[in-house]
């Protein structure tokens, strides 16, 4: 089973994450940041990943440390659960619309962290959530999962829709990239022989 449990404790946050990459999309989320929980639910449901997140952070200051550290810990959990990447498809992509909004996410489980984030947010906040924290989440994820991630919001007016389509497309791109190809069982998807 491709599963992992990761705990991260700092002076700012305490994060516990459990994932099952071969799940059914179940999510138990208690990050302390309600909008982040809503977005993590999109990853679980659209990625068909079982995800449990429990976090305590210094949200009395702001949500930055919690959102970033959840991204870091989730990235660590993915790296652990994927292992040597043998048999996975490696690449994944998805376009997701929501009313007037369209976003595209492309992921490569290359072992090389990289983030291209092109989301021209139409406002600074969605409720209490600072939209700039979404890039901090994804930066934390890519640096610790060892993936290359391209995120583009192609059009959109509603900032909530912009963020939500990004997270839904991310979940679907993960699902594609992590699918095990039976024709490549046990084979690392690289001409180098390792990732």
Swiss-Prot record:
Q: Name one GO molecular function term.
A: imidazoleglycerol-phosphate dehydratase activity
Show the SUPFAM superfamilies listed in the entry: Ribosomal protein S5 domain 2-like
Highest rank taxon of the organism: Bacteria
Q: What is its main location?
A: cytoplasm
Compartment annotation: Cytoplasm
Pathway-wise, it operates in: Amino-acid biosynthesis; L-histidine biosynthesis; L-histidine from 5-phospho-alpha-D-ribose 1-diphosphate: step 6/9
Q: Which UniProt keywords apply?
A: Amino-acid biosynthesis, Cytoplasm, Histidine biosynthesis, Lyase
Which Pfam families does the entry link to?
IGPD (PF00475)
Under the heading InterPro entries, the entry gives:
IGPD_sf, ImidazoleglycerolP_deHydtase, ImidazoleglycerP_deHydtase_CS, Ribosomal_Su5_D2-typ_SF
Q: Which GO terms describe its cellular component?
A: cytoplasm
A GO BP entry is: L-histidine biosynthetic process
EC number(s): the record gives 4.2.1.19
- Kindly report, in one word, the top-level EC class recorded for this enzyme: lyase
Give the catalytic activity: D-erythro-1-(imidazol-4-yl)glycerol 3-phosphate = 3-(imidazol-4-yl)-2-oxopropyl phosphate + H2O
Decide whether keyword Cytoplasm is in the record.
Answer: yes
Q: NCBIfam families, from UniProt?
A: PRK00951.1-1 (NF002106), PRK00951.1-5 (NF002109), PRK00951.2-1 (NF002111), PRK00951.2-4 (NF002114)
Q: Which family does it belong to?
A: Belongs to the imidazoleglycerol-phosphate dehydratase family.
Q: What is this protein called?
A: Imidazoleglycerol-phosphate dehydratase
The record lists the organism as Polynucleobacter asymbioticus (strain DSM 18221 / CIP 109841 / QLW-P1DMWA-1) (Polynucleobacter necessarius subsp. asymbioticus)
Q: What is the lineage of its organism?
A: Bacteria, Pseudomonadati, Pseudomonadota, Betaproteobacteria, Burkholderiales
